[in-house]
């Protein structure tokens, strides 16, 4: 876990060079997070009473449902543990994938009992991800791996890419009385207009030419 976002710890392999306490933009965004209630979708990740036993909950959310975890951009050792678990899964080595998942959970959740194939929980009903990177419906094991990943990398810039590589689900959020929809095509960003105008044959990515401003 990240205790001091500005000081490299033992499991910080790479840190963004702009991540320092003198960066006004970083401090502004870190302050703004506290004015945005944490989504129920994220809270639902902590199943079966784990909101009181999982250290990530207390580190991420306060009693007012505000995000209190410092924004972070970098690579931690936990990232490789999740890569290991998911790689084992996609190679068909489910026992090894489950073992990797249990090893990480044991470091995060007080008194946790290891999952077995029989005790794996259902995926949270509110979760946006329902298919894997191959478009196949999630199994309980993969859903558990992705659920733990969601908890682990909250406010670390990971979620967008998780959604993108696992089906690119469409969803909407409300803000100031308006509904904002994240459409599937938006997982691929638009090409800047200046590049299209100055590069012969350059075509805008699908979806953006139909937008009305």
Which role does the model predict for each range below?
Residues 1-24, 44-213:
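Acidic/polar-rich alpha-helix caps and helix-coil junctions
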Residues 32:
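Aromatic (Trp/Tyr) and acidic
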């Amino acid at each position: 876990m990240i205790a001091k976002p500005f000081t490299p710890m033992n499991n910080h392999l790479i840190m963004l060079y702009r991540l320092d306490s003198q960066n006004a933009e970083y401090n502004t965004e870190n302050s703004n997070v506290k004015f945005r209630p944490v989504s129920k979708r994220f809270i639902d990740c902590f199943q079966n009473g784990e909101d009181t036993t999982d250290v990530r909950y207390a580190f991420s959310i306060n009693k007012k449902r505000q995000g209190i975890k410092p924004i972070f951009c970098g690579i931690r050792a936990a990232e490789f543990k999740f890569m290991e678990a998911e790689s084992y899964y996609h190679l068909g080595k489910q026992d090894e994938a489950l073992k990797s998942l249990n090893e990480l959970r044991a470091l995060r959740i007080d008194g946790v009992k290891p999952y077995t194939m029989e005790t794996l929980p259902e995926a949270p009903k509110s979760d946006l991800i329902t298919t894997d990177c191959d478009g196949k419906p999630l199994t309980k094991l993969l859903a558990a791996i992705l659920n733990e990943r969601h908890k682990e990398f909250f406010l670390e810039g990971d979620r967008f890419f998780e959604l993108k590589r696992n089906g690119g689900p469409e969803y909407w959020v409300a803000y100031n009385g308006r509904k904002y929809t994240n459409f599937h095509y938006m997982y691929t960003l638009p090409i800047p207009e200046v590049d299209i105008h100055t590069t012969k044959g350059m075509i805008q990515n699908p979806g953006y030419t139909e937008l009305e401003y």
